[in-house]
Amino acid sequence: MKNLVRLLTKKKLKLSVAESCTGGMLASSITSISGASKVFNLGLVTYSNQAKIRILKVNKNIIKRYGAVSHQCCLAMVNNLSKISKAHINVSITGIAGPKGGTKQKPVGLVYIGIKKGKKVQINKCLFKSKKRSSIQKATVKKTLDLIIRISK
């Protein structure tokens, strides 16, 4: 965590996040580090579909057609967050942390992580094997931090 804050500070980059299944854990992890105010711009928890639609302006047809846990929804979340926040790096997370809510097509542990830096956008599909909610959330935060560091270098 300290490495991320140090790297973003050195590069003079601002970060914003929109979280769903992690419920603010990513923002909390980053802002727990002294100096985070230099790099952390905005943190949103858009847990419900309505929050994604109202706050992040995700088109309701995307959620209806593909679901909130999808590549398409994650992409809309990160693109629209970047319009709101004007940060250099924007991150979106949507997934199924469990222990319930999974299906054969979308099992518990399925998470999409979107990262946008400038015009470059990447959507990462992850499947965390744990059935424990907290383990999936922690693994998602760790993976997201690694991705942010990688794109920031």
Model-found features: residue ranges?
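Short alpha-helical segments enriched in small residues
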Residues: 1-153
